[in-house]
């Protein structure tokens, strides 16, 4: 199970490696600056990803989406390659020009993404985001 999770993370990260948030202009293929909720990925999964890909993950986390947005505003998004956050915060980050457009030609599996999860309200033209996982509301 752990190996499957590590492979899933590896595939996901490689797909989204070029989704950089800011226009920092630096491209270091040996590192991935990830910013998401605390506890999103167990350390053993991150370690497995690094071991299998050779890509070092600089994992920063936040507790609240608003804290994440404040950090992106402070750095103009340039400190992170990949941010995983809630939809309404993604919409604000795009509106504030804190995210850069995707170069989908560099994402080899882009055409395999399920269209059901594409064209969301926060990115209707799929210019800035790719789906990471499906959220299903529960009652």
Description of each model-found segment:
Residues 1-32:
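Short, low-complexity disordered leader/linker segments with a strong preference
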Residues 21, 58-60, 101-104:
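Short hydrophobic/aromatic-enriched beta-strand-loop microsegments
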Residues 50-52, 99-102:
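Glycine-rich, phosphate-binding/catalytic loops in enzymes
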Residues 95:
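Phosphate-coordinating loops and pocket residues in cytosolic domains that bind phosphorylated ligands
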Residues 25-92:
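Early extracytoplasmic/lumenal segment of secretory-pathway proteins
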């Amino acid at each position: 199970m752990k190996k499957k999770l590590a492979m899933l993370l590896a595939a996901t990260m490689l797909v989204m490696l070029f989704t950089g948030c800011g226009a920092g202009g630096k491209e270091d293929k040996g590192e991935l600056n990830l910013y998401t909720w605390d506890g999103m990925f167990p350390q053993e999964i991150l370690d497995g990803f690094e071991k299998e890909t050779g890509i070092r993950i600089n994992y920063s986390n936040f507790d609240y989406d608003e804290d994440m947005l404040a950090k992106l505003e402070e750095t103009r998004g340039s400190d992170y390659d990949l941010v995983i956050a809630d939809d309404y915060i993604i919409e604000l980050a795009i509106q504030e020009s804190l995210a850069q457009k995707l170069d989908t030609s560099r994402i080899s599996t882009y055409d395999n993404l399920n269209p059901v999860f594409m064209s969301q309200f926060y990115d209707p033209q799929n210019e800035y985001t790719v789906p990471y996982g499906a959220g299903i509301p529960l009652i």
